[in-house]
Amino acid sequence: MIHNNRLRIVMQKNWKLSNDSKDLLARCGIKINLYKKKLIAFSENMPIVYICVRDDDIPGLIMDGIVDVGIIGENVLEEEVLSRKLRSDNIDYIKLKRLDFGTCRLSLAIPLDKTYKDISCLNNSRIATSYPHLLKKYFDKNNITFKSCMLNGSVEVAPRAGLSDAICDLVSTGATLEANGLREVQVIFRSKACLICKVGDISSEKRNVLNTLLTRIQGVIKARESKYIMLHAPIKRLEEVVQLLHGAERPTILKLAGDNTRVAMHMVSSETLFWETMENLKLLGASSILVLPIEKMME
């Protein structure tokens, strides 16, 4: 029996989104033992219970107010919203935070030997997909008539099997499309994982836990987006160095022993450091450049 005073978080039970969700919560300092076949688990150090379900069940559990919080892909969320609108079901939820994983896109793809100029080439085509409502929304917006072939998996084999003329499926790298003789021609929806919660009363105890969780998630994401930079820079080029690094705050400047022309600079950079940036730092006279990951960060 799940105690009502625990914050109930629901997330995908399998696949990569599940692993990324567990990793995020672990980085937030929440201790939990979620084994592969264990679908319910209690946090050891916070009043939280985790429930693992199929990803397409998560939006409904939130919208119906059965659980408090969910981690879900925006593609699944929006598909369920459109589906529930047709059934006149409740679609209320609050999006608390867009997360930094689960990046993918829902795209149209056609066989390599098929000619494509624009979306009108697919007029009156049969499209295989697991996302019929998102597909219909996009085609209706573009005044395209189509016939759908609903598949819950292996969508990419549909054209070769003679089931469809094209497909509408999730794409991450495009390798699966290429392996099945398909090419991506149009992105119709871009998606990331997001944190959502139910609309309605949440007890003050649960609200406090949720606020703590949100603060920690923000800290984890900010840390992953930032780097700690240490370098030596000429005093006369200091402002140019600072402008190049886009620091979250002004840098810490330290004197160097026995050198009046250079200083040591420490700062948190809010942008990813590419090799080109480091090479430009070198051109400005910087040396001993160190770029370090940040484990945790709180502003």
From Swiss-Prot:
What regulation of activity is recorded for this protein?
Feedback inhibited by histidine.
Q: Which GO terms describe its biological process?
A: L-histidine biosynthetic process
- GO CC annotation: cytoplasm
Report what the protein is called: ATP phosphoribosyltransferase
GO molecular-function term, one example from the UniProt record: magnesium ion binding
Superkingdom as given in the UniProt entry: Bacteria
Q: Give the reactions, separated by semicolons, that this protein catalyses.
A: 1-(5-phospho-beta-D-ribosyl)-ATP + diphosphate = 5-phospho-alpha-D-ribose 1-diphosphate + ATP
